[in-house]
Amino acid sequence: MERTLLNPPPSLRSPACRTTTATRIRPSSSMATMIPTPPPMRHARLVKASAAGRRELHAPPIAPPILLGLRSPAAASYGRASGGGGRRRGARVVARMGFDMFTDKAIKAIMMAQEEARRLGHHAAGSEQLLLGVIGEGTGIGAKVLRGAGLSLKAARAEVEKMAGRGPGMVPMEIKFTPAAKNVLQASQEEAHQLGHNYVGSEHLLLGLLREHGAALVVLKNFQADPSNIRSEVIRMISDTSEDHQPVSAAVGGGSSTTKIPTLLEYGTNLTKLAEEGKLDPVVGRQNQVDRVVQILGRRTKNNPCLIGEPGVGKTAIAEGLAQRIAAGNVPETIDGKTVITLDMGLLVAGTKYRGEFEERLKKLMDEVKQNGEIILFLDEVHTLVGAGAAEGAIDAANILKPALARGELQCIGATTIDEYRKHIEKDPALERRFQPVKVPEPTVDETIGILKGLRERYEIHHKVQYTDESLIAAARLSYQYISDRFLPDKAIDLVDEAGSLVRLRNAQLPDEAKELEKKLKKIMAEKSEAIRSQDFEKAGALRGEEVELKSEIMSLVDKSKEMSKAAVDSGESPGPTVTEADVQHIVSSWTGVPVEKVTVDESSRLLAMESSLHRRIVGQDEAVTAISRAIRRARVGLRDPRRPIASFIFAGPTGVGKSELAKALAAYYYGSPEAMVRLDMSEFMEKHTVAKLVGSPPGYVGYAEGGQLTEAIRRRPYAVVLFDEVEKAHPDVFNMMLQILDDGRLTDSKGRTVDFKNSLIIMTSNVGSGVIEKGGRQLGFAGDGSGDGGYGVIKNMVEEEMKRYFRPEFLNRLDEMIVFRQLTKLEVKEIAGIMLAEVTGRIGGKGIGLQVTERFKELVVEQGFDPSYGARPLRRAIMRLLEDTLTDKMLAGEICAGDSVIVDADGDGNVVVVGRRSAGLPDLKSPAFTV
């Protein structure tokens, strides 16, 4: 892109421009003559030159000199102006800047500088914004050197804002550059030219910043960063590597580099150097695996270990441990002095648009490794080699590397999961034989505790908290017990990390006084913005002063609070923020939904009163309610077997006595919601081909991608009641599937994932033996108002014998308890009637109608709804017929309206009588009315 400029005023001309008005400046390709640009300025008009395929900016006659406000620096380049356009008031002066020589990282730094200026509300970007851009770019040599000097983007931003302040807002679309910034850009080109580079990178921008005595140098000195030391470090790093070997406009894949091992360091990371600098986490344990890797690396040929293990067991940590050993000199002479470099395969493949580019990169990398002779490549996710870079007519990375791997010319450590190794590596026997597998097992809980203690210091420094030993032990044990689909030590480390974040956030809140000032500050900033919009700049200036004062007060309060906390910690009065076992338990509960926190006093009383609470919904059936309550208390206190489900029951008995209702009541009362119940109607699994729906359809069948009805429900909510209703109706193959659920608390779905049932309560209902119960009903005493315990024992034994004939012994033997439900007595049915009538009262009360029923009506309902063979369901039908249908007819006829209160009674003939409170002549009720 070319910028064509009018002749500036004499006071603003460079010495080269003052010779004559007709003089054109023709700078070299590596250096641009930068002309200061006084405000105000207009945007130039962009037209495309047809002859040379360039773009020219033809400034109108009154246009000022060059704007370096680049909308798209990556596409910009400055060239000589064409002859068109004519001259008015003198000749045009061309300032040409070779942006085609700037690397992607340098362009990114320049664009970020413009954004930093926009963020601060400034109309132009200065040298201080260029400094922020170099830091913010993050990956270039300039950013690395500045980070090493102690500058972070956040701290540098705060320093620049404190020094330069904020602008008035209303930032133009195009951010210009100050004269100082232009001098920096020119100086960066001069530095590149002096170093013999045909490109300008972020390192050259930093060298240019060090030459310009401006705001950027002031910022550096405020951070006690010595410019001479920074310059020396930049030169040293440039001699080792280069962030880009081609300018932006150069042909892809062309050119050559003058660096020692550029491809390796461009596409990889030096783990040995990171280990020497102490930037790698310590590796605890894994002695056997590291020794085995060293042993394989010492072979003459095929000296390529491949670490195979589940995700998160620490395969990458073994490579880092090897790098730490090499850095410490604690290795045999066969690999002493070698360098471990981890290769980024994604970065190696990225950008290879044309055929042959990927192969050229890979061959260049292999040549560098061979020439150096002291390089050990670490390929994380080594299975990505298979197929990497393979386009039509090309070969993939694995086939390119095979000869070198077999001859021992290339030493490589691979790491991949068991599944990926089987799918990709084992499928290619020629590739498999070149790698020597090293199995990396999941560490035990005790080994994980040791790993966490080794990492403790790193996480304490990062989160600025302290970890107790109990919290680390809890993280290892709870993650092993409750997080089933991941592996140690990864899941335990994540628990420790998130618990530290939780405690830090909890203790990082502003003081109360600072919070009030923060609210006031937000209000003032809103008023200032409104004043700027209404162009009341006098008011905006006054508000700006208040804003600065408030920010200063808030900062002083925060600093004072931090100093007090630090003083308390240093003096021993306060231990500082500490991660405890309870914090780790809280994180586990939030991840899994399983309550693992210690039982509180309120929960203890609720657990002890569980029977009475369940009896509000379940009438009778004391044995079942007691067994359920015992299982829940045992699990909550932590005395149950952690390898099995909370409990597994089978409820047997006649229909309508409360088997399914007890499971619903338990889910609503203890688990907090009726939705915390996975209910499967086993009549849906009567046929053989439907059994697979529990764990998911096999591959190739409809529904394979959806997963199983049972396994997916438990994966989403592991802490729940699982109700298998009418279990005797299921196909016999279902019981084979239940064996491992009842015994081991686990089930494998169709995709090979293990689903954990260890935090579920398994309840199965069955009508097996209901005939025996009905025949022996009078022995149970349902004809009267009591129940005979002796008769119940006889009937229970008979039902258990019936179940043994129906179910297999290996199935019944895995159940915790078989509970036989009693038939309902008339007194129990009357109590259930009160519960059902209360439900109807609540529903009609929602419509604004009060309802009372008499004792006589209640007896009528019980009389018509009592059937010992069918339980409570006939009672529900009687209430529907006698009460709900009668009230419905009255409401539709307009006899009962919202706001009325009605009494429902029964006459001597058993007919239902409904009387409204507003109607005259209420009948003389022989039985008193009561509110349900």
Curated annotation (Swiss-Prot):
Positions of region (I): 264-511
SUPFAM superfamilies, per the entry: Double Clp-N motif (SSF81923), P-loop containing nucleoside triphosphate hydrolases (SSF52540)
Record keywords, A-Z: ATP-binding, Chaperone, Chloroplast, Nucleotide-binding, Plastid, Repeat, Transit peptide
Pfam families according to UniProt: AAA, AAA_2, AAA_lid_9, Clp_N, ClpB_D2-small
Region annotation (II) ranges: 579-770
Binding of ATP, residues: 309-316, 653-660
Annotated segments matching region Disordered: 1-20
Domain UVR: 518-553
Annotated segments matching region Repeat 1: 102-167
Localization (cell): Plastid, Chloroplast
Residues in Clp R domain copies: 99-240
CC terms in the record's Gene Ontology section: chloroplast
Region (Repeat 2): 177-240
Source superkingdom: Eukaryota
Cited PROSITE patterns: CLP_R (PS51903), CLPAB_1 (PS00870), CLPAB_2 (PS00871), UVR (PS50151)
A molecular-function term among this protein's GO annotations: ATP hydrolysis activity
Presequence boundaries: 1-48
Stated role: Molecular chaperone that may interact with a ClpP-like protease involved in degradation of denatured proteins in the chloroplast.
Family: Belongs to the ClpA/ClpB family. ClpC subfamily.
Name of the featured protein: Chaperone protein ClpC3, chloroplastic
Record organism: Oryza sativa subsp. japonica (Rice)
Upper classification of the organism: Eukaryota, Viridiplantae, Streptophyta, Embryophyta, Tracheophyta
